[in-house]
Every structure is written in C-alpha cells, then in structure tokens.
Amino acid sequence: LSDWSSDVCSSDLLMCDMRFAARSAKFAETYVKMGLIPGAGGAYYLPRIVGVAKALELFWSSESIDATEALRIGLVNRVFDDDKLAEETQAFASKLARGAPLAMKLVKRILYRGLETDLRGALDLVASNMPVVRMSEDHQEAIAAFREKREPKFSGK
C-alpha cells in the first residue's frame, strides 16, 4: 500500500491475509467523522487485527496513522521504503511460493477456524488435518529434499 489508504480502501486492506506498506503510507478510518459507521467488514476485521480498544480508538478519533504506527499495532505486516515496496513484496511472494501449497492452505484454514472455537476445538482441527499433510506428496518431497540437501519442489498434493 502506498499513499493514502482510508475508509473503503482500508476495508479491502483488512480482508487481506498479509499487508505490506510503503513508508509514506497513511491510514485512517474516517466513518464517524462523516457521520457513518464502518461498512464492508471493517467493524468485523479491524478489532480482530488490532484489538477492540485500538479499533475503537481508530474509528472514534478518525485520526490518521503512519506506516510505522500501522506496523506497531499489527495493521500491516511489513513496511518498506517507497522505492522498494514492489520489489520487496515480490521477493516475499516468491519466498512464499516456494512453500508447500497444501500445508499453507491448511495452516490458513486452521488459523481462521481456530478463531471461532476454543482450545480443544483448535487442537481437534490440527489433529484432523495432520494425517492429510503427513501422507502428502509434499511432505515426502520435503523429507527427500532434506536428506539430499536440496530445495524441495512441491506439487500441492
């Protein structure tokens, strides 16, 4: 994200699994200042990302925050110099692309579903998915690659 990200744009931002920002980026939730309430999922996502108290502060005050503060409160995952944002984001995406797709998909599913349950339910989610990944071609490839001291080539199976 670069330049200003506010209101409608930030609702889209909040729906992302990971958020990177340029150092010059600023963020604001100006609904209340406009006599409105947050729509498009903002009131759902923001407190889950930054906590209820910080979400209320951002909504009620309508104050803008810079990228450094957004990083500090967990609104964004990483901040890069403006001229490096695209390059660094691409480098991170390339790093993720080398991961095991099935395991990545299941980690995401377990994390998000885990937010809706208690510890026992979260552990059950892990237990029910562990055989899937342990029997996967990707896991076998990871073991072979480790033994052969090479990078794995995952298939997503």
Residue ranges of predicted features:
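Short acidic-aromatic low-complexity motifs
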Residues: 61-65, 137-141, 149
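Terminal low-complexity tails and localization/encapsulation signals of metabolic enzymes
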Residues: 144-157
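Short aromatic/basic micro-patch
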Residues: 4, 64, 79
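A short alpha->beta transition loop at the rim of the catalytic pocket in nucleotide-sugar-dependent
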Residues: 17
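Hydrophobic alpha-helical segments typical of transmembrane helices
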Residues: 42-45, 54, 66, 106, ...
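C-terminal long alpha-helix characteristic of the crotonase
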Residues: 20-25, 67, 76-124, 128-131, ...
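Single conserved hydrophobic/aromatic residue that forms the stacking wall/gate
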Residues: 1-12
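Conserved catalytic cores of soluble enzyme domains
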Residues: 14, 24-75, 90-96
